[in-house]
Amino acid sequence: VLLSELITRVVGSDKAQLSISREEVQAMVDVGVEEGVFKAKETKAIRSFLKLGEVHAEQIMTPATVVATVREDMTLKDFYESEDEHLHSYSRIPVYDEAEEYIKGYVLRADVLEELSEDHFAQRIGDLIRPILTFRDDEPVSNIWELMLEKKEHISVIIDEYGTMRGIVTMEDVIETMLG
């Protein structure tokens, strides 16, 4: 528990209140390894977690070229009948208006299916849109992690300096990065 609190303080964004450095936490981990407190996988996870501030969104994102997106004026019936297998594979799908590279939010596939079960076939995807967290491609993954946890969101869009989507980062991407 103590180590968990220390790591959280080290990775946290308020640098002015740090009373322990990353190096000190790393030294504690090394001692824990020597004394048999940590297993190899645990050590790797802790070390990866400590490096989250050095990893940026562009390094872990899923590139826009392979992200399934949906236009906000698409009907739920068209969504359901779409032959794009990716629309049926993911739980959260980014939504755009006219230009696919400018994401407005996302839709939960479960929300679409719920509305379809109530025979709302003519309803538009835009009626179900949820806000999406947006980060620049050079944002440290530690900041993304903190905000995703705070907002209880599992998806974020990564943009360039012009607001164009470069890709997405999901909670799963961050966790995989933390676990090494």
Residue spans of the language-model regions?
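Hydrophobic alpha-helical segments of integral membrane proteins
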Residues: 1-10
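Transmembrane helix-loop junctions in multipass membrane proteins, especially transporters and channels
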Residues: 9-17
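Soluble cytosolic regulatory domains appended to membrane proteins
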Residues: 16-180
